[in-house]
């Protein structure tokens, strides 16, 4: 909203440009609420799978909500220029999509580097066999490696959105990312709970 006031101040589009981020957030909040109803256990009884199902549904519905917010606020045509770059409603919609894609990629990367059946965690476990020193070294190496892909994804998203609609496009992408915060926080909160519960059940030799 602040950037909208800076870039479009004194123009007829000011009010709608300031309302656009609010419309995106409102749409994503509604889609997050709807997504919670899809968090149900499947035939494999995977709790994390149920949470990811809700996240996928929320993301898919957020695309529709983003399109609706764009259509009913600023439209799909040109709304002005930002830093010499023409800003169009369609470009802002694409910026929002990029924000959602960046969020999805970060979730996938996080799952890869923290999953117990993936190479990074298994390599740390294997290094533990030879002692504490190799465990610490391998853990540090994996932790440093794990920051590379998210950084590349975020930088790529920033460059793409800036080329499409300047700083305002980057702000819209960030707004779309924050629109999924409800489901992301739910994953962060319940993920460790399910992992710990699974570990306790395994050490107790309980049936699946």
UniProtKB/Swiss-Prot annotation:
Its cofactor is Mg(2+). It comes from the Bacteria. GO terms for molecular function: diphosphate hydrolysis-driven proton transmembrane transporter activity; inorganic diphosphate phosphatase activity. Homodimer. It catalyses: diphosphate + H2O + H(+)(in) = 2 phosphate + 2 H(+)(out). GO terms for cellular component: plasma membrane. Belongs to the H(+)-translocating pyrophosphatase (TC 3.A.10) family. It is found in: Cell inner membrane. Keywords: Cell inner membrane, Cell membrane, Hydrogen ion transport, Ion transport, Magnesium, Membrane, Translocase, Transmembrane, Transmembrane helix, Transport. Its EC number is 7.1.3.1. The chain crosses the membrane at residues 19-39, 54-74, 89-109, 140-160, 167-187. Its main location: membrane. InterPro entries: PPase-energised_H-pump. It is a multi-pass membrane protein. Proton pump that utilizes the energy of pyrophosphate hydrolysis as the driving force for proton movement across the membrane. Generates a proton motive force. The gene is hppA2. This is Pyrophosphate-energized proton pump 2.
